[in-house]
Amino acid sequence: MSCLDLSAVELSASIKEGKTTVKEAVEAVFSRIEEREDSLNCYVTLDKEGALKSAEQIQKKIDAGELTGPLAGVPVAIKDNLCTEGLLTTCSSKILGNFVPTYSSEAVINLQKAGAVILGKTNMDEFAMGSTSETSAFGPTKNPWNTDHVPGGSSGGSAAAVAAGECFYALGSDTGGSIRQPAAYCGVVGMKPTYGTVSRYGLIAYGSSLDQIGPLSRNVSDCAAILEVISSHDKKDSTSVERDDTDFTSALVDDVKGMKIGIPRDYFKEGLDNEVRDKVLAAAKVLEEKGAIVEEFDLSLVEYAIPAYYTIAAAEASSNLERFDGVKYGFRAEDCEELHQMYKRSRSQGFGPEVKRRIMLGSFVLSSGYYDAYYLKALRVKALIKKAFDEAFAKYDVILAPCAPTTAPKLGASLSDPIKMYLSDIYTISVNLAGLPGISLPCGMDKNGLPIGLQLIGDCFKEKKLIQTAYSYEQARGAFPLAKEGK
């Protein structure tokens, strides 16, 4: 068996047992990258030299017994909106095409302390704005199951890299479904933790009240181990929460007897593909057969989530992206005689069309004549959505739903119709608006051989219940394969 067939936790155990080495694992991954990267475009930046150097140092620490954690020695890919000291960090945007941070994000630092080897930075929708990974300035990432299709977004490079075996696990960020939806499209596990669980320090912001960093992995066990490592209280992030229940691997228990699972009727109405509906409901049946109590219920306000989300996220983006002006770092337009001309040209040439669209939308909803009509109204809807979830979690331990209305669409199908792209987030964005944890894991394939994702949603700080439920389903489902050569 090749080390590429092992999960992250299995690989680390194999290294500690002397069956393989960190260097061998890194070289094996880079061989896979050389085989598949030209057709997939998962990475913006690769750092083979740095990875091999880290591998040597980490191997010595493992041999000396200094690194004993479940991820020690395991190669990881990092989404390109997470700062990595000395390694290009572009947000897949021309405007940051030459930006090399002088510091690393807290999540990356935590992984490095645990013995992770950074392979490189993964492709994404520009500034995490998109659902297909086609808005990248460095070209689209393609789905490893079928390269005519998108991998989802915005963490499409991370999801595709995990699914293709181009890394053992990856970090992504989730503002409205950007971990869970690509995980569903690529047939991997993706988790968005409760807001505040993982420090946002070093994450280049899109929507600060919605952004959260999380893992993409091959299975639930890896997901729990990664989340345990990256979760920490951080004084550098004022929204970081101090928790004493981050031993997430303790929730890897195959038992859902008596657990109450709610299925929101609102998520199974018009617009949901029949194959997706059938596979998700079949997964619910599996959990019911294992002893869970499964009931349908009404979760109101779902239809208002998309307009509320795109109002709030765009407003925050328009503010956050004001800092990219070509003055201190990033792309600067040439031949500008006046300062205002340099600002205008740098931003006009540096940002792509989707980013410009959201900046303009955000500026509009924050303008004096429309602030109350749009932005304040969206904040009220956000509060009502949180209240609706609170009422649901008074009755249920976990909510079970689809992750996306369809399987992965074809490349180019969403670019000409942004509304269609926005609607693909309909089942994920409410989780971000309410600050809740959610996990996506594969529950089958459609007739075209594309993965279907099951979404489980939990109450705030109840990641353990999600992990337990997901793990129990995964044990019944069996191992889900890596994507072989697409098409």
Placement of each model-derived feature along the sequence:
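An N-terminal boundary/leader segment
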Residues: 1-52, 289-290, 482-487
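Serine-dependent amide/ester hydrolase catalytic core
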Residues: 12-13, 269, 301-302, 325-433, ...
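Short alpha-helical scaffolding segments that buttress acidic/His motifs in well-ordered protein cores
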Residues: 25-29, 308-309, 355-363
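Residue-level signal for inorganic ion chemistry
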Residues: 29, 51, 104, 223, ...
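Structural helix-boundary/capping segments
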Residues: 35, 164-270, 281-293, 360-390, ...
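Short helix-loop capping/hinge segments that flank enzyme active sites or metal/cofactor-binding pockets
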Residues: 71-91, 250, 255-262, 315-386, ...
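Short glycine/serine-rich loop/turn segments
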Residues: 71-213, 264-266, 315, 401-419
